[in-house]
Amino acid sequence: MAGHHHEHEQERDHEQEHEHDSLQRPTTGSERTRSISFSKLLTRSWKRNASSSNNMSVSSVNLYSDPENSRESDHNNSGSEGQSSRFSKLKSMFQSGNSSKNASAHNSSQSSLEGDSASSSSKLRYVKPMTSVANASPASPPLSPTIPETDVLQTPKMVHIDQHEHEREHSNCGSPIMLSSSSFSPTVARTGTGRRRSPSTPIMPSQNSNNSSSTSAIRPNNYRHHSGSQGFSSNNPFRERAGTVRSSNPYFAYQGLPTHAMSSHDLDEGFQPYANGSGIHFLSTPTSKTNSLTNTKNLSNLSLNEIKENEEVQEFNNEDFFFHDIPKDLSLKDTLNGSPSRGSSKSPTITQTFPSIIVGFDNEYEEDNNNDKHDEKEEQQTTTDNKTRNLSPTKQNGKATHPRIKIPLRRAASEPNGLQLASATSPTSSSARKTSGSSNINDKIPGQSVPPPNSFFPQEPSPKISDFPEPRRSRRLRTKSFSNKFQDIMVGPQSFEKIRLLGQGDVGKVFLVREKKTNRVYALKVLSKDEMIKRNKIKRVLTEQEILATSNHPFIVTLYHSFQSEDYLYLCMEYCMGGEFFRALQTRKTKCICEDDARFYASEVTAALEYLHLLGFIYRDLKPENILLHQSGHIMLSDFDLSIQAKDSKVPVVKGSAQSTLVDTKICSDGFRTNSFVGTEEYIAPEVIRGNGHTAAVDWWTLGILIYEMLFGFTPFKGDNTNETFTNILKNEVSFPNNNEISRTCKDLIKKLLTKNESKRLGCKMGAADVKKHPFFKKVQWSLLRNQEPPLIPVLSEDGYDFAKLSSNKKRQTSQDSHKHLDEQEKNMFEERVEYDDEVSEDDPFHDFNSMSLMEQDNNSMIYGNTNSYGKIAYTPNSNRSRSNSHRTFFKR
């Protein structure tokens, strides 16, 4: 037997030397490192037999050993260790062959005992043979005060063998060593020496001993170490299982046993002092001056599976986490309504797909016992935090909590049993449990009744969709594609105050107005219904409203309100302080700008046209008069009365590689042609004059005319009259003045845009993508156009140009009576009553014009100031804009 014993000792020495290199040094509670998850070390068969509990396992291991005991221990063990190791090496030299045979025979017998679960798991290591406590093999000193030697996990099939050996050991040893119930300084038998360790010295394993347990932790009386090698008597198989778990992993020697590895019987005995009224504190620390690791552990690092991810913890009290003032007459065992200790230790079946987010106490449940395929998934969700279990509830804010407990807010893998503890003495929580809806997970779990978190923690009720009133929309508004952006009209003509006239046309006027309620400035376009009926422009205003309401682009004006009265239509739009871009060109001496500035404005116009084409709209009226300057200096397209929407527009196609993605905008209006003769005569495309119909390519023709006018100050085909202008457009080729300051790429772009054959014109194939690929726009950052510095900034100034006076020259004021009539007419415009959509009859020609307000208004609208000279604009150069061609700045031209 002695030879056989030393043969196994030799093999275990080699194995321990190999395992020692792979062991990780346990960290203190303040270090933030990842620790080993207990659920990852358990096999499936062990996991199915583990039971969940509300019990708390406290491990009080002291890292600072007693110097006297450690020196004496080293002295006693040094000689025996050397003698044993020399004898083992000498023995192996002569009996190497016999040792191999015995080792293989022992491994085969051990494998037969462990069964399939041990053979299928790669995480199980060699299990030490069970020996008697009376074994007098010498114990070696510990490797380090903080590095306990890990033992191996035993499968559930080995539990009954462990119990049999354990009972035989106790029968041979006589009376076991028991802990005093009056002291929390445990005394643990030390094999081979009969010496007792002091509470300040951590119990470390013996490297060369055959004891089945390698780690022992100092625990209170209620938490005895159930390892067979320590000589504790136990007739409870569940307690023996918990002892095997404690002895199998060094992690739990410091952190305590997880609740899902403990049985309900441990919980019952743990609560016994309180049930008997003995007055012994359940979670009192050992009578040692040195704090244990569990007391100095940083609670802010706790997370799922004890992985310290710096998860924040909200603490409601600043006192010690453990409570010490629990009433003696309170039986925590009686308050655990939902504890597994009341019934079977079998884990409940959780059918919830994802872990619940629980506020307050936490506990862990295991997966269904028969559902093996979800074991590995549930291992990631199993938690090992036991510090918030078994709390004595008191009233706090009308809910059940303990006055000296720091309640963390953290995740839990399932609905906690600790919540039942808090709700056991709270009438509000019990009533909330009764009124819980059928959608609760408890309805799907037989025998489980877990209240929602808000039943015992006061929380603000979550807002429901029904709490927010749905915006009012008329039946006609709900049928429009832009109905999600607007609601029924919130303003009227009386809500605005006229500041001055900005411009006028054949069917209406544009006023600068101030909203009385918000003091914001807008541009209000007022159209006469009578004039529109006479000129047959009803469809035009409906198209303009649809484009303005549908568009959401930085280079297209924003529509805030649109409504109608008995005589007028109103379009309340964003006020562009810079006025018409045509006016800005007219303020220049040569009526033109340099090539770099023209490239900037042309690129923004191209981006706006691309957006309109994506929506299926053809602008058809691009000219400097319809381009407005925002207060930031960027352009804004307006006046969409001549625009038209292509019928049966197709979805745009994205082409190109990842580095150069292009959007085919021509397909949005592909196949659509219109014969309308619209546009300004100098900007009309040749196909419009011919009357054969036109497509979206007319917008690229007008872009070429616009770039030409920005560079040279006049249009390329202008004649003395309309007929001569049309003749030049149809027959003459574009020519450039003798000006070498215009680059070749710029001239090439203009020529390709002004190609008379629309099928060969630039942009006829892929729309805006063809234009943006031209070398003229090579350095343009299309995605950052809105953030680029514009060439000039409009500023309100008394010395600026008064555009209202310029436009007044077009008025026909033949007499003073007509002037009074105009004033009276403008006054009536702001006194009309709004007609809502439901009030307009179906036979009304303007019944499709919606009275609506934008739901989310832009706060960047200008605020009215009395000192501002609205209408008088001065243009200042932007000093932040870099110019490569400085000798031809905006003002020099």
From Swiss-Prot:
Active site: D621
Low complexity biased stretches: 49-62, 96-122, 206-216, 422-439
Subcellular location: Cytoplasm; Cell membrane
Aminoacyl-tRNA synthetase in keyword set: no
Regions that span the bilayer: none
GO BP field: phospholipid translocation; positive regulation of clathrin-dependent endocytosis; positive regulation of phospholipid translocation; response to pheromone triggering conjugation with cellular fusion
Ranges of biased composition (kind: Basic and acidic residues): 1-23, 370-380
Post-translational modification: The N-terminal non-catalytic domain is phosphorylated by YPK1.
Keyword Membrane: yes
Alphabetically ordered keywords of this record: ATP-binding, Cell membrane, Cytoplasm, Kinase, Lipid transport, Membrane, Nucleotide-binding, Phosphoprotein, Serine/threonine-protein kinase, Transferase, Transport
Swiss-Prot/TrEMBL catalytic activity: L-seryl-[protein] + ATP = O-phospho-L-seryl-[protein] + ADP + H(+); L-threonyl-[protein] + ATP = O-phospho-L-threonyl-[protein] + ADP + H(+)
Polar residues: compositionally biased ranges: 24-42, 76-87, 228-237, 334-355, 381-399
Lineage top rank: taxon: Eukaryota
Basic residues: compositionally biased ranges: 884-893
Membrane topology: Peripheral membrane protein
Stretches assigned to the AGC-kinase C-terminal domain: 778-861
Family: Belongs to the protein kinase superfamily. Ser/Thr protein kinase family. KIN82 subfamily.
Name of this protein: Flippase kinase 1
Organism this protein belongs to: Saccharomyces cerevisiae (strain ATCC 204508 / S288c) (Baker's yeast)
